[in-house]
A protein has these predicted regions:
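Short helix-capping/hinge motifs at transmembrane helix termini and TM-loop junctions
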Residues: 35-40, 44-48, 79, 102-107, ...
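Alpha-helical transmembrane segments
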Residues: 71-79, 128-142
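Alpha-helical transmembrane segments of multi-pass membrane transporters
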Residues: 83-109, 119-130, 146-162, 178-187
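Membrane-proximal transmembrane or re-entrant/amphipathic helices at the cytosolic face
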Residues: 156-207
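Transmembrane alpha-helix boundary/hinge residues in polytopic small-molecule transporters
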Residues: 70-71, 97, 113
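Residue-level recognition of transmembrane alpha-helices
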Residues: 21, 55-58, 62, 88-92, ...
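Specific pore-lining/lateral-gate transmembrane helices of multi-pass inner-membrane transport
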Residues: 1-88
Length: 207
């Protein structure tokens, strides 16, 4: 569609791809926040458990890095590697600069995970606004709300389970599984994935 000059069709295609990406990336990121303490307790030595919150910031940053891949599509399609390199360089410089300042100032390497997120977020913003005149993908506010709400309810469900159950490997798997079920159910009830779910169900029934 891009090669044919149909930018609107390309924008719709990328917008749907972004929606599908967020359907997976948001719960994955929120899930890391929900079970990072369980994961650290069950899998790591005691000395490393305290740093479990680092996992969330790394996952949060990676989520925005994934979004950036969709934002830079116009530059990729036109082989404008200079624009990509320039923005990624700025994002990296922000990360390094903040590390040099804040780690020395605060004396905590925990801040490195936060600055990594900030660097990825800056890169995303630069890419998003840098390509908006060429190709602007959009995500419906209703879809974003449903995804965030479903992820929030998933987090709450896992949080409640953690109150009553010990942190170990078996329960880690249980928390993740229950979180996936809750997220999927809320998404379906909200109507966000009802069409996709019904399509899959119909294919299974026909077989």
């Amino acid at each position: 569609t891009w090669a044919e000059g149909d930018k609107e069709a390309t924008a719709r295609l990328i917008s749907e791809a972004v929606r599908m990406y967020l359907l997976l990336a948001v719960p994955a990121t929120v899930g890391v926040a929900a079970v990072s303490d369980v994961m650290a307790t069950a899998l790591f030595e005691q000395a490393y458990v305290e740093g479990h919150s680092i996992m969330f910031w790394v996952a949060f940053g990676m989520m925005f890095l994934g979004l950036t891949e969709y934002s830079i599509k116009p530059w990729e399609l036109t082989a404008n590697t200079k624009a990509i390199f320039k923005r990624s360089l700025i994002g990296g410089a922000v990360n390094v600069g903040l590390n040099l300042i804040l780690i020395k100032l605060l004396g905590s390497y925990y801040i490195a995970s936060v600055t990594t997120f900030i660097g990825f977020f800056v890169y995303f913003l630069l890419a998003r606004y840098g390509t908006r005149s060429q190709l602007r993908w959009k995500l419906k506010g209703k879809s974003l709300f449903r995804i965030l709400l479903s992820a929030a309810i998933m987090y709450l469900a896992i949080y409640i389970l953690k109150i009553f159950m010990p942190f170990n490997k078996i329960n880690l798997v249980l928390f993740v599984f229950c979180g996936m079920i809750v997220y999927g159910l809320v998404l379906y009830i909200s109507g966000e994935v009802k069409n996709e779910a019904n399509l899959v169900l119909n294919k299974i029934i026909k077989k």
